[in-house]
Structures are given as structure tokens and as C-alpha cells.
Amino acid sequence: MSGETFFLSNHSVAASQIAALAGLSFVTEDFAISAAGALATAGIGEICYMDDTKYIEELKVTRASACLISPRFKELVPGGTFSFVTPHPYAIYAQVLALLYPEATIPASNFGTNGISSKANIHASAIVGHGVTIDPGASVGPNARIGGFTCIGSNAVIGPSVRIGRNCYIGANVTVAYAVVGDRVIIHPGTSIGQDGFGFTFLGGKWVKVPQVGGVIIQDDVEVGANTTIDRGSMRATVIGEGTKLDNLVQVAHNVTIGAHCVIAAQVGIAGSTTIGDFVAIGGHAGIAPHLTIGEKAQIGGASGVMCDIPAGERWVGLPARPSRAFFRQFAALKRLAKKK
């Protein structure tokens, strides 16, 4: 079955403009790039990138008009492909993609329309800013505020008194309750924000629910992946810091504070009242126990189980998680011991 092309570039980018993005001087005759492609499939008028030894063979046979390439691979680029040599090929490639396919950078209405659908349910007391798009089936509750040029997808629910900033995208089937959302926030489909935290106490031989009376604060420029859940705080807010990016299927429990510009991969679970500093990176399927502090710029490997605080700037891996050097030393020692048997 042949694949459909869902993103067609209606733009072209001059090679000299790409060179400027990469901080390079452009000394040859200018030419246009009209699309992007993978190393193995890119052709005339298209640009690709390469920065990993896994793709050397594909690089050798690429037919792309141009390639953003790490310095260590520049000699391998075929003669018919123009090389933009940069230490950051993927980052420059991302900027070129944004120029070629601006609609892929910021999601828009699934219906390709602007304005408020007659099939949306908007409470009379809600305040909806200029240029807002609300798709069919979406609901906006009493006293909610939607900032200008925000898009609310089909069947999304914006709860009472929720605040959504400007230029946001709230995907289809998203629920936002008891929350304040900043500007330029992207929330992908199926995500739930502001539901009860998991609070129970054992009393009289049974589990008794502890009312969760906090909220959620999502600061500017945050992106939240599909089917992620962010619980509201028990007494104070659960906070997602400015510029932080959450992947799909991430669980953020009540009272968690995540700092600015963190990246958290899919299936990470962060238990209640844990504090994560700025610029922290967490690999997929990692779990973090409650009431911990993860220092700024720390890195946590995928599938790690974090049971104690992590100092700033350290890299921890394993289950239970420990400093990466200690983990790999212990792993090597076990291998040597196994060979002796």
C-alpha cells in the first residue's frame, strides 16, 4: 500500500538561507530547497540530514540536492549533493522543516477551519478571545477564559474557571479542569489535566478518599503529549515549568513540580510531591518515587527506578537507579563473575 503525503510544502527555502541558519558563508550559486526527505529517499530539490554512523551506507547513495552533515562525515557525501557542514545538523534541519512545513510546527483544527463551530457548547459566562477556533463537540465551561488565537479541538472539555492562554492548541478529547495554562502551550489529543490526585487514607478498615483541592499550573511554551495525565495538587498546585516537553503517556501525580525546559519521554511516572529542577532529562519508562528532589540538569536513563534524591548535574540509570558509572562498573563486575562460573 502506497503511503499518502499529508504534509505538502507550499514554500521553498533558498540554500543561502539554510547556510545562514547554520552560521556558514555561502559562496556558490544559490538554489532552492522545496521539500525535506530521508537520506534513502530524498531526491532533487530536497534536503536531508545525517549525524549517526548507522546511516553511513544510506548517505553514500543519497540523491538529495542538499544534506546537513556533521563534520566527521563530510567526505562521504556524494558528489551530486551539496553539503552544509555543521556540528548541529539535526537542530538546523528542524529549523528548515519549520520553514518548509509551518503547519506541522503548530497543530491546527482537524477540520482546517477557523472560528467557533455552531456545534460547540460554550457557556454564556465564558470569555473567548479574538481569533479563537473551537471545533464541533468541544465544551467550554462557566467562567472559563480562552486567550486569543487558541484552537480547541473536537470533544475537548475546558472546565469551569479554567484559564487558557494565547496561541495555544488543545487537541481533540482533551480534558482541562482546575488549571491555569500559559501562552503557546500545545496539549495533544486524549490528555487529561486537573483530575483528582491519588489521595487515600486507611480508616476504619477501608480506604477513604482525601479531597484534592489544589490545581494545575502549566507555564508558557509547554508541550504535553497524547494521553498524558497531570493530576491536580492536594492542597497546592501541580506545576509544569516553562518550555518543558512531556511525551505521550506520561503520568504526573499530585503536587509534583517540574522545572523549566525539561524533557520527559513516554511512559514516565512521577509520583506525588516530587520536585524536578530545570533542564532535567528523563528517559522513557522511568519511574520516580514520591517526595524526592531531582537536581537541575540531572539525567535519568530509560526504565530506571529512582528511589532517592539525585544531585544536580548527575546521570543515573538502573533499578534501583544509581550513578551511571557505579551502575556500569557493577554490571561489568557481574559479567566477569558469571564468566568465572
Curated annotation (Swiss-Prot):
Q: Name one GO cellular component term.
A: membrane
InterPro entries annotated for this entry? Hexapep, Hexapep_transf_CS, LpxD, Trimer_LpxA-like_sf, UDP_GlcNAc_AcTrfase_non-rep
- Residues in the active site? 254
Q: Which reaction is the catalytic activity of this chain? A: a UDP-3-O-[(3R)-3-hydroxyacyl]-alpha-D-glucosamine + a (3R)-hydroxyacyl-[ACP] = a UDP-2-N,3-O-bis[(3R)-3-hydroxyacyl]-alpha-D-glucosamine + holo-[ACP] + H(+)
Q: Does the keyword Iron-sulfur apply?
A: no
Database matches in Gene3D superfamilies? Hexapeptide repeat proteins (2.160.10.10), MurE/MurF, N-terminal domain (3.40.1390.10)
Q: From the UniProt record, give the pathway where this protein acts.
A: Bacterial outer membrane biogenesis; LPS lipid A biosynthesis
The record ties this protein, via Pfam families, to:
Hexapep, Hexapep_2, LpxD
Q: Which cysteines are joined by disulfide bonds?
A: none
Its top-level enzyme class, in one word, is transferase
Q: What protein family does this chain belong to?
A: Belongs to the transferase hexapeptide repeat family. LpxD subfamily.
Q: What does this protein do?
A: Catalyzes the N-acylation of UDP-3-O-acylglucosamine using 3-hydroxyacyl-ACP as the acyl donor. Is involved in the biosynthesis of lipid A, a phosphorylated glycolipid that anchors the lipopolysaccharide to the outer membrane of the cell.
Query: What is said about its interaction partners and assembly?
Result: Homotrimer.
- Protein name per its UniProtKB record: UDP-3-O-acylglucosamine N-acyltransferase 2
Q: Which organism is it from?
A: Nitrobacter winogradskyi (strain ATCC 25391 / DSM 10237 / CIP 104748 / NCIMB 11846 / Nb-255)
What gene name is given for the protein in this entry?
A: lpxD2
